[in-house]
């Protein structure tokens, strides 16, 4: 039988050089709270540090996933080929640009 693996939790927010001055309040279900408290205790962190770390790491991963654009090799090549060798503007594109120029006032 395999031994359970204990995950080491590092407080990733400790390296952020600014004071803790902002509050976050939220409600949750009793079972969720108990589970978080148990995991926090097993990790050697208090409830707040554990919850903040988990939320912060998830936020960073979510932002990174949304900021990254992954392309297959063929798509990558087509994308950069189009940038390097753009097609000549069509009549419809010229008309659209003209309407835009007449409608939008730049500051």
Curated annotation (Swiss-Prot):
Keywords: Plasmid, Toxin-antitoxin system
InterPro entries listed in its UniProt record: Ribbon_hlx_hlx (IPR010985), TacA_1-like (IPR014795)
Record has ATP-binding as a keyword: no
A Gene Ontology BP annotation from the UniProt entry: regulation of DNA-templated transcription
Highest taxon of source: Bacteria
Keyword Nucleus: no
Subunit structure comment from the entry: Forms a complex with cognate antitoxin TacT.
Family: Belongs to the TacA antitoxin family.
Role this protein plays: Probable antitoxin component of a type II toxin-antitoxin (TA) system. Should neutralize cognate toxin TacT (y4aS).
Name of protein: Probable antitoxin TacA
Organism: Sinorhizobium fredii (strain NBRC 101917 / NGR234)
Gene that this sequence comes from: tacA
